[in-house]
Regions:
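Secondary-structure junction motif
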Residues: 60, 75-96, 161-170, 178-179
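Flexible hinge/capping segments at coil-to-helix
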Residues: 39-50, 54-76
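Beta-alpha-beta core module
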Residues: 37-48, 63-64, 110-158
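A bilobed periplasmic-binding-protein/Venus flytrap-type ligand-binding module shared by bacterial periplasmic
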Residues: 53-59, 152-161
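Thr-Gly-centered strand-to-loop micro-motif
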Residues: 54-55, 79-80, 102, 125-126
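N-terminal winged-helix
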Residues: 2-18, 81, 88, 126, ...
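Short hydrophobic/charged patches on amphipathic alpha-helices used for structural packing
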Residues: 17, 21, 42, 68, ...
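Central regulatory/effector-binding core of bacterial HTH transcription factors
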Residues: 2-37, 99, 105-108
Length: 179
């Protein structure tokens, strides 16, 4: 028996969504929500709040949360433009009439965290990622927003899925990570 070929690749959410829509990928795990006109079926796996990653010093020690308006006063370190979360943050800033001062864009959360430690600015990262960082030098505060980091599976509506893709979806059924 031949085993199915499984290819795992990494890319920003928008790049991955485009690959699924073009038929280059059968399905993918990506940030949700996707654009309504994308004709993609989605299955939410988990959802987490966003945090503002700051140095453990100065005025940040007095803060308990950070509003989108407060972020305008600080250089901002965020994900690359091909990340869905980056697009969602830009929409959040527009809704709150905030003009962000973007200092650094990266696809690597550990690089963004290192830049915060170096004093370059503040970053917006999902809470589970913040929990992996050094609490002695960094602090993460809730972002005052209903925006959440949601990850889920996507695939093209009404298109045949291979047996391996169907098996992977079945594997993901009921799979959620704790809040």
């Amino acid at each position: 028996d031949a085993l199915p070929i499984l290819k795992i690749s990494e890319g920003g959410g928008l790049t991955v969504q485009q690959a699924v829509m073009n038929g280059e990928l059968d399905l993918a795990m990506t940030a949700l929500p996707v654009e309504e006109e994308s004709a993609l079926t989605t299955r939410l796996l988990f959802s987490h709040p966003l945090c503002v990653l700051v140095p453990r010093s100065g005025d940040w020690l007095e803060q308990t949360s950070v509003s989108p308006q407060q972020l305008a006063a600080h250089p901002l370190l965020i994900y690359n433009e091909d990340f869905a979360l980056s697009r969602q943050l830009m929409q959040l800033f527009t809704r709150h009439h905030v003009k962000p001062r973007i200092a650094v864009r990266s696809g690597q959360w550990d690089f963004l965290a290192a830049m915060v430690q170096a004093g370059v600015g503040v970053a917006i990262l999902p809470e589970p990622i913040c929990r992996r960082l050094d609490e002695k030098t960094l602090r993460w505060l809730p972002l005052e927003s209903d925006l959440r980091w949601q990850l889920g599976m996507i695939w093209r509506e009404g298109v045949y899925l291979s047996h391996s893709a169907q098996a992977w979806l079945k594997c993901c059924e009921g799979f959620t990570l704790p809040e």
